[in-house]
């Protein structure tokens, strides 16, 4: 349980402190999502419940699709602007 909390906090801190780089922001979001998935998986194993384990697999599949869509948007953003840096005005 504490490992998932540490991973989630690392994801939040990475998202907050790397506001200029889109790739690091996507990685931070994935770390947060996978830490929650790990928490669900550990809880379902401790409770001997198969539904939590299937839900964790479902979350991992959705996270993979999310990563693919995010990277496709990133490629389109790079082609449009020539950079992946975010500029706040």
Curated annotation (Swiss-Prot):
The lineage of its organism: Eukaryota, Fungi, Dikarya, Ascomycota, Pezizomycotina. Keywords: Electron transport, Membrane, Mitochondrion, NAD, Respiratory chain, Translocase, Transmembrane, Transmembrane helix, Transport, Ubiquinone. GO terms for biological process: ATP synthesis coupled electron transport. It holds the Pfam family Oxidored_q2. This is NADH-ubiquinone oxidoreductase chain 4L. It is an enzyme of class 7 (translocase). GO terms for cellular component: mitochondrial membrane; NADH dehydrogenase complex. It is a multi-pass membrane protein. GO terms for molecular function: NADH dehydrogenase (ubiquinone) activity. Signal peptide: none annotated. Its EC number is 7.1.1.2. The gene is ND4L. It catalyses: a ubiquinone + NADH + 5 H(+)(in) = a ubiquinol + NAD(+) + 4 H(+)(out). Belongs to the complex I subunit 4L family. PANTHER family: NADH-UBIQUINONE OXIDOREDUCTASE CHAIN 4L (PTHR11434:SF16), NADH-UBIQUINONE OXIDOREDUCTASE SUBUNIT ND4L (PTHR11434). Core subunit of the mitochondrial membrane respiratory chain NADH dehydrogenase (Complex I) that is believed to belong to the minimal assembly required for catalysis. Complex I functions in the transfer of electrons from NADH to the respiratory chain. The immediate electron acceptor for the enzyme is believed to be ubiquinone. It is found in: Mitochondrion membrane. Its main location: mitochondrion. It comes from the Eukaryota.
